[in-house]
C-alpha cells in the first residue's frame, strides 16, 4: 500500500510531481507480481488517473507518504506501535498516526496496538519471530538493552531480537542497515570502511541470530546539497531499503556504480524474484522503497484491494 502526497501539502510541494511519478512507476513494477493499492485524496487523484489502473486507487486521507513508519509492522501478525517523532514534531506525528488509525478502523484492519514508541522503519523482521531494531528504540522507551529485547519478545511473540547501534543519528532506522531476504538469510551493509562500527554491528547480529546466514552488501552514501531536505540523511546508495514479499524483493537502485554488485549479491542469496526500482528521484528525502510501503496480507489485504475495486 502506498500513500500519495496531497496536492495541498506544502511540505512536499517542491517534490510533488517527482513523488507521484515515482509511485506510478513503482506501482507498475508491483502489478503482476504482488497486489498494490495507492491511497489518494480526491484532489490528488487526477494526477494518477489514466496512469495506473483505476481499481488500485483508493480515495482516502492518510496524512504522509512514509507509510512504513506510522502503520503496522509484520503483515502476518500486525502490531501498531506508537509513532515517534524523529522526523517531525510530536503534534504532527500524532496527527499523521491518527489519520492512519481512522483509515484502518474504517476498513476494519485487524491489528494489535501497543504504547511502545517505534517507527516502522526501525523494525526489520523475517515475519517469523526474528526482529532487528536500533538503540533508538531503547532511548525512546527508556529501556535498558535487556528490557528492550524482552519487551519486543513479549509484544510481538518474537524469538530472537537484535538491537544495533544506528549508522545515522537522525532517524536511526534499522531498515537502512539490514534486510531479511529469506527465512534464514540476513543481508547487512558492508561497513568495512568503518572497521570498529562493522565489528559492533556484526557481533550483535551474530550473537542475536546464531544460526542465520549473514551476508554483507556494498553500500555507498550520498550527501544532499546544502539547503535540500535539511535535517535528513540522504537514502541514496542504500540498496537494502527493499520491500520483501513472499515471492519478490523490490530493491531500490540509484544509478550508482555499486548498484549492480549489490543486486548480484542479493540475487545470489535468495530464491525470490529481484525487481529493481529506480529511486533516484525520492532517495534524497531520506527514504526509499521500503520506507514508502505499508505491507498487509490475508484478510486485511483483501479488504483494501476490494475497497479500491468497489470505488
Residue positions per predicted region:
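Histidine/cysteine-enriched polar flanking segments
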Residues: 1-311
